[in-house]
Amino acid sequence: MIQNKLQNFVDTLPISPEKSCSYYPERLSQIQYFPFPEEISKEVLQFFFDSGFRRNGNILYRTSCCGCKDCLSYRIPLDQFVPSRNRKKLLKKNSDLKICFESPNLTLEKEILYLRYQRSRYQNFVIEESDQELLEGMRWNLFEYKENSLEMTLSLDGKILCFMILDFASDSLSAVYSVYDPDYPDRSLGSFAILSSILYAKELGMKYFHLGYFLPGHPNMDYKKYWTPAQIREPVSNENRWIETDDFQKRYSDFSW
């Protein structure tokens, strides 16, 4: 009954006007969105994650684009996840890092790291934005909403090399955004942050780890296909069916894997 009520509610949510897509600038994108109140239960949050929604600030959203279904919701079934040999090597390589999971806490050190990360990794996209504009976006997107939110930090000798914001639902953790120091490429900090969060979610007894949107063939989003075993939400409106990646490839062969 509650699931049906939530689904009926989701069906009434507004859809934004079209704007340029952040992944494919030549395309137009739209989102279906819900500006939720300050408090939202973990069970309701879980329903939204299962329905393909993500969070920015106090906005839950999912893509709702006309003629494009390339943004695929991607999650790891944790009872099936076992670190591969390469993942174990990554754990060993970064065994000197201190890993902490706690309530999100914005500091000057993290703001400086965020700016360095943005200017290094997304130079062409943020070239016209001032430091103040970037920081205002970060504060609202990542640190404004702390209810059901978790922050992971990776530190070396007291220096923060990486932080990741996660959402804490009833059956899963969902990755919101990660920021890492570009001066340590050999450590693969982005991958290590994901791996550490997945293992933490397993320790908590969670069922899933949501990795956000997977865009097959996209230079910045294609990497998620290497996190397996995984499930993809079928790109069918209002049908919350998740299928294994192998089955998805067979059923939707038009996606360039």
From Swiss-Prot:
It is found in: Cytoplasm. One of its GO terms (molecular function) is arginyl-tRNA--protein transferase activity. GO terms for biological process: proteasomal protein catabolic process; ubiquitin-dependent protein catabolic process via the N-end rule pathway. It is an enzyme of class 2 (transferase). Pfam families: ATE_C, ATE_N. Keywords: Acyltransferase, Cytoplasm, Transferase. The keyword Cytoplasm applies. GO terms for cellular component: cytoplasm. Its EC number is 2.3.2.29. The keyword Cytoplasm applies. It catalyses: N-terminal L-glutamyl-[protein] + L-leucyl-tRNA(Leu) = N-terminal L-leucyl-L-glutamyl-[protein] + tRNA(Leu) + H(+); N-terminal L-aspartyl-[protein] + L-leucyl-tRNA(Leu) = N-terminal L-leucyl-L-aspartyl-[protein] + tRNA(Leu) + H(+). Belongs to the R-transferase family. Bpt subfamily. Functions in the N-end rule pathway of protein degradation where it conjugates Leu from its aminoacyl-tRNA to the N-termini of proteins containing an N-terminal aspartate or glutamate. NCBIfam families: PRK01305.2-3. This is Aspartate/glutamate leucyltransferase. The gene is bpt.
